[in-house]
Amino acid sequence: MVTIVLNKYKLLDKIHIGQQKLEDLLFNLKSEVKPIDENNIEIEINADRLDLLSSDGIARAIKGLLEKELGEAKYNVTDTEYTLIVDNVRTRPYALAAIVYNAKIDLEELIQFQEKLHGTIGRKRKKVAIGIHDLRKVDSKTIEYKEVPLSYKFVPLYGNKELTISEILEKTEQGKLYGNISIANGVSPAIVQDDGEVLSIPPIINSNKTRLDENTKDFFIDVTGTSFEAVAQTLDIIVSNLAEAGGTIGRVKVLKSANSSQLSSPLFLHKIQNVREEYVKKILGIKTSKEEICKHVMRMRMNCDIENGVIRVTVPQYRVDILNEIDVVEDIAMSIGYNNLEPSKYISTNYGSYDYMTLLERKIRELGIGAGYVEISNFVLIKDEKLFSNKYVKILNPVTEEYNAVRNSLIPGLLDFLSKNQHAKFPIRVFETGDVVVYDSSTDTGFRNDKRAAYAIMDNKVSYEDIQAPIHYILKSLGLEVNYKEENNNIFIEGRSASIFYENEKMGVIGEVNPDVLIRFGIEYPAVIAELYISEIAKRLTNQR
């Protein structure tokens, strides 16, 4: 939870309701209100609802619940003459900027909003840092984000004399806290005017030149960081909340100096999330319709359309909490009100039993053992160089490069096993069943889990027929009369491989391993391999039950 302190009278004035009503509506948004004194309240907000970290963001959400405003908020957006040139900044390579004109906002609240974003999406400024400047005091319409030497001088925020960046790191609290994040090789990231004057050294401190005051209504906002997505989301969150305070958003041209590519910032990107009516009914246990679902989505300040019977929700980028379908369902529950969802007693007379997939996998393992194969078990993680497809899940910051990817097939693991057991008595017959993660563009993540089984034989002399016979036996024992269609790929010898089909559905692959692949794995003997797609087999067998 993230805690913010707001003036309750200013907040209530934005939405024209009483305090008890405010508390009830915030409870629906998974937030709690605690009074501090006569004028101020403390609000605990879920850490994923970054758009609610200011009074204007809260007001926007509550206006939707009150049906004073429905759907995504519309803001005044205009082009400006301002340009941000992004140079090659090695420690924090991404930057975007925007202008906001005539926003009527409490300065203390704006600073609180900025720091709460630093602590959440910004990961204490390590991932994202925000600079907010008084536009009146920015002299140049061309701003550059670049590396500067530590000898650069400027007056830091609330300072009264020029200091070098080195001195700022040594003498200021911000320098001591955040200097180690971005300083490297004797240079610092900096936001600089075209005359060379420094406006800020993110993520450390702004220049005193563009300090905000009570009369500031026009803002220049820069966001820098290590993740482009987080930078774009953060900027959208800030400018949309300032626009709720009456501001007009000004676009800034962003030029990447290395390749001259141009963006118009803020990006205001949206995501389309499809929602199934039956899924909503199942999760919430309610009777509803597509139209009613769309109404609740609109109350949660997102746009919703029904196209060809499909509910399409348009998610604004500042709603960083909406990752997939279940998050939209949660928003629908908030719109309905948790207190309005009727609890029902769940009565079950079912007895525990094995999942069908577990039983099928057990059967396949028993058949493999019965066919004379020894079961092995490899890690789900693997070295990416061993994979045959470039569509796989890469591990960020792996503990070791030997396990830097998630396997998308069982075949590389079997080949790796064979390469390490060439000294064993021949023939070697092994198999494995287990999970892989395969590419699937139809899913939210672009990948899905798949259950598979793979079989391998290595001997002084071995051919396609040696593996085809036991595989056919296993599939026939499962009740599948399959056929084999010649199909070449980079794993097997051309003309000595096939795909396994049942009623035009691919159930697996089989073939003699290509000598180039054997050399790649350091295998000196011929090998044959088959891989069965258990998930697909399960679908077919389930349909036959």
UniProtKB/Swiss-Prot annotation:
B5 domain segment(s): 268-343
Necessary cofactors: Mg(2+)
Enzyme type, top EC level: ligase
Keywords: Aminoacyl-tRNA synthetase, ATP-binding, Cytoplasm, Ligase, Magnesium, Metal-binding, Nucleotide-binding, Protein biosynthesis
Keyword Protein biosynthesis among UniProt keywords: yes
CDD domains for the chain: PheRS_beta_core (cd00769)
Gene Ontology CC annotations of this record: phenylalanine-tRNA ligase complex
UniProt catalytic activity: tRNA(Phe) + L-phenylalanine + ATP = L-phenylalanyl-tRNA(Phe) + AMP + diphosphate + H(+)
Gene3D superfamilies, sorted: 3.30.56.10, Bira Bifunctional Protein, Domain 2, Phenylalanyl-trna Synthetase, Chain B, domain 3
EC number annotated for this UniProt entry: 6.1.1.20
Principal location: cytoplasm
Binding, Mg(2+): D321, D327, E330, D331
Family to which the UniProt record says this protein belongs: Belongs to the phenylalanyl-tRNA synthetase beta subunit family. Type 2 subfamily.
HAMAP family reported for this sequence: Phe_tRNA_synth_beta2 (MF_00284)
The protein, known as: Phenylalanine--tRNA ligase beta subunit
The species this protein was found in: Saccharolobus islandicus (strain L.S.2.15 / Lassen #1)
Record lineage: Archaea, Thermoproteota, Thermoprotei, Sulfolobales, Sulfolobaceae
